[in-house]
Regions:
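Short polar/charged helix/loop
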Residues: 1-123
């Protein structure tokens, strides 16, 4: 949801990438549906490992983790000027599809709001 929010709700102020510490190997079906609804190219989405972005080939102004600290260890970024953590419970654990989709959509909008506030603070 972070990638979607950064790339669709911030008017180009941020470019979002997404990766997980334990990628599932596939995109959550509710997340795919949201991408479709907001007209985000599903081909740009992938279930990638954080290792892809944690080498010296990538450098970020902000690395924002959104993992559920109660259930998993959040990654540490050394190739970022700023590291932030916004904790969200993992919606993939929600069994009911409609409830999971609603939760993902809520997270999507919440991250977008936080990114826009962050941009205002940095300016």
């Amino acid at each position: 949801m972070g990638e979607l929010a950064a790339n669709t709700l911030t008017e180009g102020k941020f470019i979002g990438y997404s990766a997980g510490s334990n990628p599932a190997g596939k995109i959550n079906n509710a997340a795919l549906k949201i991408a479709e609804e907001i007209l985000y190219p599903k081909a740009r989405l992938a279930s990638e490992s954080i290792e892809l972005y944690s080498n010296n080939n990538f450098f970020f102004d902000f690395a924002i983790t959104v993992c559920d600290q109660a259930r998993e260890t959040c990654p540490v970024f050394h190739n970022s000027l700023n590291t932030l953590h916004w904790a969200y419970e993992d919606p993939a654990l929600i069994i009911d599809y409609e409830i999971r989709k609603q939760k993902l959509f809520s997270i999507y909008h919440d991250i977008g709001s936080k990114l826009n506030l962050l941009f205002k603070q940095e300016m």
